[in-house]
Amino acid sequence: ENNFATETEKLELGGSMRYNYRDADVVTVGSSQRFLQSGDSYSNSNKANSNKETGFKADFRMEWRPDSMTNIIFRPNVSYDKTRGASVAESGTFNEDPYQYVVNPNDYLNFDNIESDDPLRDTRINATNEHNLSKSNSLSANATLQLNRKLNNEGRNITFRGSFGYGDDDSDQYAQSETRYY
């Protein structure tokens, strides 16, 4: 965050700016066994998440005193935020321990990998592949203008104040999930 300020007899300026960026990737690999009376069940999963966020915010303040009876204050600000997210998840359930057949069952969870060659087909109960995407953008701009004039030295004033605001938000999401039973 950056701040600045300056002042003269008739003019006072100040403001700040902030920029933020975040990029996070998470990969999770799982394997579990359920102990059931009707027979054990085995599950394997892969998940990858990627999230990116960018943000910018700035505000400004100007106070002008053209004479001893008048002051004008102008305060604009703007902010922008952008986010992007993506995730891929693959999972499978088996009626026998898949490690009896292959070294890494998690290599056989993606539909593309098991279409032509599936060494776990005889023990596979189901497989699920999911894809999710999201994005959003947000922009806002605001400003306030105030004009103040003393009418006399006894404390009477007249003030005019106006404000402006603009906002634009947009977000999109996409999700696909497919489960196949064997």
Where are these regions (language model features)?
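Primarily recognizes Gram-negative and organellar outer-membrane beta-barrels
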Residues: 1-182
